[in-house]
Regions:
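Phosphopantetheine-dependent thiolation modules in NRPS/PKS and related acyl-activating systems
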Residues: 1-37, 41-83
Length: 83
């Protein structure tokens, strides 16, 4: 599964986006772009990514830049997986 597909799946489940998740691409804005994407959503998304990929995300790794777009979240995840 490609990273963007995995991120879409997590976003679909965490934010209850249903079929809308399929329309998300790398340039889709998360912060300010999806009404469902708030601070609680960040916690849900991070927890789901940690569980699904066996990674640990430290609080100091989280920033607005990570959650700006689907693509920025994918790059963050890829960096964690390559570490």
């Amino acid at each position: 599964m490609e990273t963007i597909d995995a991120v879409r799946s997590v976003l679909r489940d965490a934010l209850h986006l249903g079929e809308r998740a399929a329309r998300l691409d790398a340039d889709s804005r998360l912060m300010g772009g999806l009404p469902e994407f708030d601070s609680m959503a960040v916690v849900s998304v991070v927890t789901m990514l940690e569980d699904q990929f066996g990674i640990t995300v430290a609080d100091d790794e989280l920033s607005a830049e990570v959650f700006e777009t689907v693509g920025s979240l994918c790059r963050f995840l890829e960096g964690k997986l390559d570490a």
